[in-house]
Design a protein with these regions (language model features):
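Asp-based phosphoryl-transfer active-site loop
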Residues: 80-94, 295
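A metal-dependent, Asp-based hydrolase signature
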Residues: 95-189, 194
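C-terminal cap/substrate-recognition subdomain and adjoining C-terminal extension
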Residues: 47-54, 58-64, 68, 158, ...
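Non-catalytic pre-domain segments flanking phosphatase-related domains
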Residues: 41-86, 101, 107-120
Length: 350
């Protein structure tokens, strides 16, 4: 199980979760409860085995009870949509988001090649390795001040303008498979949270369609979403640039343009979720102020719903911070959302 092998590849962890559900296909009524879905599939849930990387407590019980109400209550499988933020919810986002590391390395290369960029942000921060500047920009953004975000965004858009979608995917995929987290000492693909990976498998085993709804780049996450999370690439919702198509002898080429299509954060999250799924999710999980509209949108008068807010409070195993989540934590208390404490609710982190 994921909780017993922190060094085990996450793809194997997710597969182990799914096998644990299949292993429950037996007849002992005390160990297992059979749930019939309104489809040709039947799933069995062994309550003693599920969410093994979660400690027994209010958060784990809330998840299991929500799934039980959804399935036993006959909510059609096609309505079982769950959405998850990525940075800080599914994988580690400190000391900086993983995609930020990817982009800063490219900006550093650009500043090396063109000295004129070294005095301009964000190339200046990348060249001087002033990652504190980036942290300040992100903190300002979550506090509602996007003045410096526009400066950062201009650099982000310039970093990969003009390259094909295939080339961008190859670069991001290679980065994620080779780069390591600066303080945790593990590869970035091993920075996904084992309890959340297990939760994704648990939901899928009970007929849910899981989606990523992230402020991070859609095309940055797509190459690894299936392998790491078991989420197909067509279920990845995220920020995006605009594209340009050019006809050629090789079937045509789509390239990134140096302009944003949309930033999938704040109010854009529910808009993009609706645009992609045509539904209000039954479950949403986030960790920051930018996730509040998505969590608000996951509300139903006549169906079960669950809002999860991941709280980073474990300096020993991960990080301890609330910056950028102050409003979300306040709303969680006011609205009865389920707070998931990394320190108290997770038996394992990675």
């Amino acid at each position: 199980m994921p909780g017993s092998g922190c060094g085990e590849p996450l793809a194997q962890q997710l597969w182990s979760v799914r096998l644990s559900h299949l292993a429950c296909l037996r007849t002992e009524p005390l160990a297992c409860e059979l749930w019939r879905l309104p489809s040709s599939f039947r799933y069995v849930e062994c309550v003693t085995n599920v969410l093994a990387t979660w400690n027994e407590g209010a958060a784990r019980r809330a998840v299991i009870e929500f799934v039980e109400r959804t399935v036993s209550g006959g909510v059609p499988a096609e309505e079982r949509v769950a959405v998850f933020d990525n940075d800080g919810t599914l994988w580690c986002e400190k000391p900086m988001p993983i995609q930020a590391d990817f982009i800063l390395r490219r900006l550093y290369e650009m500043a090396q090649a063109d000295p004129g960029l070294r005095g301009r942000q964000p190339w200046k921060a990348a060249y001087e390795r002033d990652y504190g500047w980036l942290g300040t920009v992100l903190a300002e953004h979550y506090a509602g001040n996007d003045t410096n975000v526009r400066t950062l965004l201009a650099g982000v858009l310039a970093a990969y303008a003009g390259i094909s979608v295939e080339e961008f995917e190859a670069k991001s995929d290679a980065f994620l498979r080779t780069a390591k987290h600066p303080t945790l000492g593990r590869g970035y693909l091993q920075c996904a949270y084992a309890p959340m990976v297990e939760l994704l498998g648990y939901l899928e085993a009970n007929g849910f369609a899981n989606y990523i709804a992230s402020g991070g780049g859609r095309d940055f996450m797509r190459p690894i979403s299936q392998e790491v999370y078991g989420i197909p690439r067509d279920r990845v919702i995220g920020s995006a640039t605009t594209f340009q198509y050019t006809s050629d002898d090789h079937g045509g080429t789509i390239t990134h343009k140096a302009e944003a299509d949309y930033l999938d954060d704040g109010p854009q999250k529910p808009i993009r979720i609706w645009s992609r799924t045509g539904r209000r999710p039954l479950l949403a999980a986030g960790n920051s102020n930018g996730d509040i509209p998505m969590l608000d949108f996951t509300q139903h008068p006549d169906k079960p719903s669950l809002r999860l807010l991941v709280l980073h409070d474990d300096s020993q195993r991960e990080f301890d911070y609330t910056s950028g989540a102050e409003q979300a934590l306040e709303r969680a208390g006011q609205s009865g959302w389920t707070i998931v404490s990394i320190k108290n609710d997770w038996a394992a982190v990675f």
